Amino acid sequence: VFGVIVGTGTGAGIIVGGRLHEGPNLIAGEWGHAPLPWPDDDERPGPPCYCGRRGCIETFLSGPGLSRSYEAAAGRFLQAHEVAELAAQGDDVAEACMARYERRMAKSLAMVISILDPEVIVLGGGVSNIKRLYDNVPRLWGEFAFSDQLSTKLVQAKHGDSSGVRGAAWLWPPSVAA
């Protein structure tokens, strides 16, 4: 399982055999600060990231990244979910931004598929509530993943954008909660 949080920022974790894989450097799954794979010419060097680099996946795929893309195209700011809603209503600019966002996500997840070959990719965070991602992104990632047979599934976290908070609550020591 490759679990992705896409909201204010982006992050991920890797589950192998039902256990979190941390890696020797404790950064396994640190996907948001990798560069956007297969960038188009106008995506280079990419927006500055708070980590000090440019063009990190997070700068493109976070909610603010989608909002920034829309603002650059339309000249006004909208939250990520508002861009998706406007696209669903037939707005051409919002639709173009969503299509580009989905292509960027497909590239980024195809890189993960080519390296980890997960059975499932789970999306959580606020952006995970954009339902069209679950049909459109898997249709696109085949162009970039190094396989002609892809069975990886893209699903929304069971508890949606509250999954991270629920997970943290499960990990909280009972003695502290009392």
Question: What are these model-predicted stretches?
Answer:
Residues 1-5, 11-13, 48-50:
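Short glycine-aspartate micro-motif
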Residues 10-11, 57:
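Histidine-centered metal-chelating micro-motifs
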Residues 13-17, 21-23, 36-37:
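Short beta-strand-to-turn element immediately C-terminal to the catalytic PLP-Schiff-base lysine
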Residues 20, 38-178:
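ATP-binding/phosphotransfer module of carbohydrate and carboxylate kinases, centering on a glycine-rich
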Residues 27-30:
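Structural signature of FAD isoalloxazine-binding scaffolds in flavoprotein oxidoreductases
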Residues 33:
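Histidine-centered active-site/metal-ligand motif
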